[in-house]
């Protein structure tokens, strides 16, 4: 059997603040989840995302400490267009979330930005810099006479 990625787990110091942030990014998280120490949702396509409070993590691993410095993880959200990257970045920073990298046209062909979730972890927002063009099927080749 080949292992497959099934779930991404996030540790949070403030469940309500974290869930509010990810709801703003379009994740459908059931109402009332803020009161739970562990929350899981299944995304379209089957991948699950889960949040655990720091207390839950410490109950499983008493030596766990909150990471400091650098990014340990960075979820990335695909936006529909470069304009949506800019608008979502502006919306989130206006709502008080930290902006880490303002939207810019990255050399790898994306409009790219990074905001900070309530725990200070980076969350990428990106879209192709230019919309993909539909491919035109090539004409069948004909043998030379």
Language model features: what each stretch is:
Residues 1-7, 28-82, 86-116, 127-134, ...:
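Vicinal oxygen chelate
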Residues 12-15, 107-108:
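Conserved beta-strand-loop-alpha-helix junction that forms the acyl-donor binding cleft
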Residues 14, 117-119:
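Acidic active-site catalytic centers that drive phospho-/nucleotidyl reactions
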Residues 14-29:
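Amphipathic alpha-helical segments
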Residues 18-22, 92, 120:
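Conserved active-site tyrosine of GNAT-family acetyltransferases
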Residues 122-125:
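Short glycine-/small-residue motifs
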């Amino acid at each position: 059997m080949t292992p497959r990625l099934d779930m991404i787990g996030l540790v949070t110091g403030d469940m309500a603040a974290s869930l509010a942030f990810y709801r703003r990014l379009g994740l459908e998280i059931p109402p009332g989840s803020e009161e739970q120490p562990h929350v899981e949702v299944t995304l379209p396509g089957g991948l699950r995302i889960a949040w655990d409070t720091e207390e839950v993590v410490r109950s499983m691993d008493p030596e766990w400490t909150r990471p400091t410095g650098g990014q340990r993880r960075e979820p990335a959200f695909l936006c529909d267009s470069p304009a949506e990257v800019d608008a979502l970045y502006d919306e989130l920073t206006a709502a008080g979330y930290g902006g880490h990298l303002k939207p810019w046209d990255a050399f790898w062909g994306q409009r790219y930005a990074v905001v900070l979730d309530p725990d200070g972890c980076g969350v990428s927002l990106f879209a192709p810099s230019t919309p993909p063009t539909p491919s035109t099927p090539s004409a069948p080749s004909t043998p030379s006479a």
